[in-house]
Amino acid sequence: MQKENKQLCLISLGCSKNLVDSEVMLGKLYNYTLTNDAKSADVILINTCGFIESAKQESIQTILNAAKDKKEGTLLIASGCLSERYKDEIKELIPEVDIFTGVGDYDKIDILIAKKQNQFSEQVFLSEHYNARVITGSSVHAYVKISEGCNQKCSFCAIPSFKGKLHSRELDSILKEVEDLVLKGYKDMTFIAQDSSSFLYDKGQKDGLIQLISAIDKQQALRSARILYLYPSSTTLELIGAIENSPIFQNYFDMPIQHISDSMLKKMRRNSSQAHHLKLLNAMKQVQESFIRSTIIVGHPEENEGEFEELSAFLDEFQFDRLNIFAFSAEENTHAYSLEKVPKKIINARIKALNKIALKHQHNSFKALLNKPIKALVENKEGEYFYKARDLRWAPEVDGEILINDSELNTPLKPGHYTIVPSAFKDNILLAKVLSPF
């Protein structure tokens, strides 16, 4: 179909799960010409994030900036989590927006634009294999969302209040999507959800993610993959073993523990324990060439100095390859919202101390890759002189990047899988030479 003589600027905020929904909207708006310049766009579509306070502020500021910069007659649309979470008041709070829609109508965005109407469907949208997507950012990597929503009841998290309960895709639908994406050239994928390790729990199956790994292995279409967002209480030694034994899934373990102290885990309503965390983490560490990422929250209400010191000592001892550190964010409709807060000054001091630990071990993780062959994915050209790549175990964007100098190559590189040797690194960037494709 011929493209309309109209330009679309889509701004996707927040997580990779949001990005998949943004790509579905691009699939519905394929007849628009894409632009990164909001000032020249005829439609500005902002897929918002409403997870924590800083994300909400970023979404609001992005909307206000677009409203200020847009040309006369441009349609300004706010979709996604922020719109959904505050749907009852957001129309009055941000009147500059022409169309509001939440997390249930990504596949109807073309209709909403045509009718210029707001819509908030009750059912949370979950992309299926038949939903056309425009994959962004890479010609060889794609995200695959396996479920929506979450059945956990963490004290600090508002996500279930606007994303609903766990809703898993059928395994056959995921396999069909993987097959279709591979035919389009996407040979590396990252499987994502709010709680990936609970995949198919809502359908009465406790080993859903193991089933998925086994089915992908048998399909033999993908070259490489990894899984994000394992939840401790639904992660098992059997799941770790399935990842370890897979020829396709990398030994990449992303499991947000949030804390290590038993008393804090209880306050956070994490439905897990220090002993269970240690059992899983030690099993992950024993996997050959494993890469372990986690997330912690600092300053949750009632976190005392002893609990913080216990966390600090553990993080220094365990040595995560990557660690996200978040300050507690008080969110409406959560158990922790009304509890007595830890002073911000104390939270900031604790974060500073933990950042020092995290950066030390991140530095060592990079250093361990130097001067030895590793498997990597070359994705695209970065500027005029370098190709951008990443360790196959790494997730896109968050774990670092590798640059390959094109002046050291005899022929240009095509996106794909290569064996490389990193020789130096600085500021989360490795410099490497290519040995050969594999």
From Swiss-Prot:
User: So where does [4Fe-4S] cluster 1 get bound?
Assistant: 15, 49, 81
Residue numbers binding [4Fe-4S] cluster 2 = 150, 154, 157
Listed under catalytic activity are: L-aspartate(89)-[ribosomal protein uS12]-hydrogen + (sulfur carrier)-SH + AH2 + 2 S-adenosyl-L-methionine = 3-methylsulfanyl-L-aspartate(89)-[ribosomal protein uS12]-hydrogen + (sulfur carrier)-H + 5'-deoxyadenosine + L-methionine + A + S-adenosyl-L-homocysteine + 2 H(+)
A single Gene Ontology MF term assigned here is:
4 iron, 4 sulfur cluster binding
**Which cofactors are reported in the record for this sequence?**
[4Fe-4S] cluster
Enzyme class at the top of the EC tree:
transferase
Record EC number: 2.8.4.4
Asked if the keyword Acyltransferase belongs to this entry, the reply reads: no
Q: By its UniProt entry, which Pfam families does this protein fall under?
A: Radical_SAM, UPF0004
Task: Give the cofactor note.
Answer: Binds 2 [4Fe-4S] clusters. One cluster is coordinated with 3 cysteines and an exchangeable S-adenosyl-L-methionine.
Q: Which domain of life is it from?
A: Bacteria
Question: Which terms are listed as keywords in the entry?
Answer: 4Fe-4S, Cytoplasm, Iron, Iron-sulfur, Metal-binding, S-adenosyl-L-methionine, Transferase
MTTase N-terminal domain location:
6-118
Taking every annotated instance into account, which residue ranges of this chain make up the domain Radical SAM core?
136-364
Q: Which cysteines are joined by disulfide bonds?
A: none
Any Gene Ontology biological process:
tRNA modification
Instruction: Please state where this protein is localized.
Output: Cytoplasm
Q: Which InterPro entries match?
A: Elp3/MiaA/NifB-like_rSAM (IPR006638), Methylthiotransferase (IPR005839), Methylthiotransferase_CS (IPR020612), Methylthiotransferase_N (IPR013848), Methylthiotransferase_N_sf (IPR038135), Ribosomal_uS12_MeSTrfase_RimO (IPR005840), rSAM (IPR007197), rSAM_horseshoe (IPR023404)
Listed under GO cellular component are: cytosol
Family membership, please give it: Belongs to the methylthiotransferase family. RimO subfamily.
HAMAP family (alphabetical): MTTase_RimO
Q: What does this protein do?
A: Catalyzes the methylthiolation of an aspartic acid residue of ribosomal protein uS12.
Q: What is this protein called?
A: Ribosomal protein uS12 methylthiotransferase RimO
Q: What is the organism of origin for this protein? A: Helicobacter acinonychis (strain Sheeba)
State the gene name recorded for this protein: rimO
